[in-house]
Amino acid sequence: MNAFSGGARRTLVGAAVSCSLCGTALAQQATPHPFDQITVSADRITPTAPGEDAARAEAARVPGGTDVVSASDYAHGRASTFSDVFAFSPGVFAQPRFGAEEARLSIRGSGLQRTFHMRGIYLMQDGVPITLADGSGDFQTVEPLALSYTEVRRGANALEYGGTTLGGSINFVSPSGHDGGGIRPRVEGGSFGYRRALVTVGDASKNSDYFASLSAYEQDGFRDWSHQENERLFANAGFRLSETVESRFFVSALSSYSQLPGSITKAQLKADPEQANATSLAGRQKRNYDLYRLANRTVIELGNDSRLELTAGYSYKDLFHPIFQVLQQRSNDYNLGVRYVAEHSLGGFANRVVLGASPSWNDVSDDRFVNVAGQKGAPTAASEQRSSNLTAYAEDQLAVTSRWTLVAGVQWTDSKRRYDDHFLSNGDQSLDATYARIAPKLGFLWQVTRDWTVYGNVSDSFEPPSFGELTGGPGIDLLDAQHARTVELGTRGTVARVQWDFAAYSARVHDELLGLNGPGGEPLGTVNAPHTRHDGFEAGAQVAITKSLSWRSSYLWSRFRFDDNASYGDNALPGIPAHFYRGELTWAPARGTASVYFITLNTEWSPRRYAVDMAHTLFADPYTLFGLKVGRNAGAGFSWFLEGRNLANRTYTATTGVIADARGQDAAQFLPGDGRAVYAGVSWKPK
């Protein structure tokens, strides 16, 4: 029997669903391009692989910044980097490091010092963590073209999935066999030796379905010593075991090879942005690894509008990584999850409760050697690194009126980091640390109209250091966990032809983890900054100007700074521009009920210089880029696109490193963006 009364259930669910569907409708109207090879069936009902409409309805319940990025939003152009995926996702700063899959990914200033890999964001794939147990992550574990959509929960809005970090969570969701059967190939190619091929296959029957993708990617790169290649297999199969139980298994296998050209000085960037860092080139620096992953997600419908979600995952990674030393690592990562969701009446009010726990742990064998032209020399370190985390969380939403919903939540996290030093010639540097904290959350949702919501929350975040911080310098850094309290106020909705998502936030951060490099790029370790402030404004908008003409944009204002620091006063934290804008104008004339072709003009604008060092003596320059995309649905299931990027061939800094004090001198901290480039792609799907 349904525990909701009809009125109570409509109070809590109806507004969220109607608002999310309205947003979906405008998103489709405002991006009318025909290149939709990764079409998702919004009508499918499979608990272990919910559709995009269900994800939007869930996001509409959240009293904070969220987004759902459909794969069709970026499939009409080159789809290679996280910058391609999140180009128009409000609040997400994603910049390629050297035109390849490595990126600088940050939300609300998360992981500011990390110009490599990722920290400060809880990454999941199909609801199962792919972030490693110590909090670090890789970008090559995701194939953008093998996704149906991506969920973004900014900041503490990731609480109901176990995310505790300042940046929040990102969940990459794979298609299931219900998203369309048959074989679907796609190929892309273009400048700098870029080549990518993908084929997917899927099918569904009454009680089972499967989906698989196989991709291969290679590029020579804009810069010297920036060749990349990888091969990736992703597959999942779902089984309806009974009327109330569904289980889905996921398999991933990938091999990644990346040359690392490193950072160069500002003068070198202006003279020849294609050159590699001399030290990187001499050390033949690269990052190669193989990864294998197994996961399961099982959903049990308990009746009375309640369900139990169970997840489990295991991954193995073998890494060979010549940088300032040669790192050779073999890691085993494990995670489990249990999540209970119930919707019922509480004192006559509609109520939704989420309870969950997510333990994770890993074991890393880490051996280090002198780098002799990219090969192993004499050993310099040997260790065993063990991480474990246990996060328990609870969140309750109570609809106190037809327009107002109050939200309260809490998390408890216990994390352990153990470093066993097996190379004792330079002394025993073993480490055993425990980090624990409770993080509360209070928020509200105000349904101003059917299509307009105002929200706000006050919430805490908690982030223990990863081994990248603890062992990333010349020795072991004894660090405290980073924690913060964030106040957020925002609005999302649709009026006529306009859809918007605006959020302002202010975070007081304590013991922020800031990594330092020397002027030559050598790692100097990580420190805790006692007090910092992260203030920002995140904006996304779409406008259907006419039936054929649409505009969409995203804007980030970021004011991250020290708070009365003894050395740096109130200086802005380096590494991310204060203002960052992307926009595109698309013309897609309709023929009948579908668009046959499209033309898109786009721009990327960083209008002000920003600091590279904490002392503010070295800066990255502003820039403006322009691009053009055209595409056509050629009939018989075929579509194609042609895209030009950086058409003015602007020399610019895509992102930078972070150093303490450049003392007014130039330093090798600049990562050039790609020059003028042209890409093309073609795909086919069965009718």
What are these regions (language model features)?
Residues 37-77, 103-106, 121:
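N-terminal periplasmic "start-of-domain" segments of outer-membrane beta-barrel proteins
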Residues 112, 121, 128-154:
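Short acidic/polar hinge/loop motifs at secondary-structure boundaries
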Residues 307-320, 447, 453-459, 481-544, ...:
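Membrane-embedded beta-barrel scaffold of Gram-negative outer-membrane proteins
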Residues 401, 406, 414, 506-508, ...:
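Gram-negative outer-membrane beta-barrel transporters
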Residues 605-612, 632-687:
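C-terminal beta-signal and adjacent terminal beta-strands/loops
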